[in-house]
A protein has these predicted regions:
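Buried hydrophobic-core signal for structured, non-transmembrane domains
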Residues: 40-46, 95, 110-115, 164-171, ...
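Terminal connector regions
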Residues: 98-144, 149, 218-244
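Intrinsically disordered, low-complexity Pro/Gly/Ser/Thr-rich segments with frequent PxxP/GP/PP motifs
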Residues: 68-100, 191-219
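Hydrophobic h-region of N-terminal signal peptides that target proteins for export
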Residues: 12-21
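A mid-sequence, solvent-exposed acidic-amphipathic segment
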Residues: 148-186
């Protein structure tokens, strides 16, 4: 999987001067590790016209009461930690597990953080030109699977007081679930309700989430089919909507 990253960070909204964006290509956009696969590589391509100095660091990705928290970790080895990518060139970053996770009961989650380091001449150059250099700051998820993977997503439908249909999911497995889109197909009326581009919908083991589907529709009890696009591909779940 490949995506083109056009850096337009929040600083761009706060600065009145022009913003110089940098283009990077990253592959893959998520890293999977485990007891039998304890090493991986990430390719970073500079699609811009100037060299880029990047710093790579691994951090632990945790979540408390729905709030993401990043903490230092020594569980992962990152090599090289600092590097320069010339225009049109590719840099390989290697990741490795420092500790074995064979006894882990559930998935461990980390992030590979890539930060751009300003070149020494940037400050003087941009001060003269009146431009603001927005530095790259990327976070790629790194998932370390347990020895035995158990996936168990539990879906149900409910109707809110305003008539909106809500899909509820709980992750009873021991690895994450990433949701991209939802579509609910009514087998009787052929209507389709959807929730598109669910930003940040990564459910860790033990987490639950409610997702409102649109548009509001007078759906019957069913049968309905919930089409869920996840990072493991599409899933189709047969559901009914409880009567009021």
């Amino acid at each position: 999987m490949r995506f083109m990253l056009h850096t337009a960070l929040r600083l761009a909204l706060m600065m009145p001067a022009a913003v110089i964006a940098a283009d990077l290509g990253i592959m893959p956009v998520a890293v999977q590790l485990g007891p039998q696969h304890d090493r991986a590589t990430v390719q970073i391509v500079n699609h811009g016209t100037t060299p880029m100095i990047l710093q790579a660091e691994a951090i632990a990705w945790q979540r408390h009461n729905g709030v993401d928290r990043d903490t230092p970790t020594s569980d992962l080895i990152v090599n090289p930690p600092v590097f320069t990518v010339q225009p049109g060139r590719t840099q390989i970053v290697r990741l490795g597990l420092r500790r074995a996770s064979a006894e882990a009961a559930k998935e461990s989650t980390y992030r590979l953080v890539l930060r751009e380091v300003p070149a020494p001449q940037d400050a003087e150059t941009h001060a003269v030109q009146g431009n603001v250099r927005v530095l790259v700051a990327l976070r790629l998820p790194v998932y370390v699977a347990p020895a035995v993977v158990a996936r168990d997503e539990r879906w149900q439908l409910r109707r809110q007081a305003d008539g909106a249909v809500v899909a509820e999911v709980s992750n009873a497995g021991n690895v994450h679930l990433k949701i991209a889109t939802l579509r609910l197909h009514d087998g009787v009326t052929a209507q389709t309700l959807s929730a598109e581009a669910i930003v940040g919908a990564v459910l860790f083991p033990g987490e639950a989430r409610s997702i409102q589907l649109k548009p509001n529709a007078a759906l019957g009890s069913g049968p309905h089919t919930l089409e869920v696009l996840t990072d493991r591909g599409p899933q189709y779940v047969a559901l009914s909507l409880p009567s009021d």
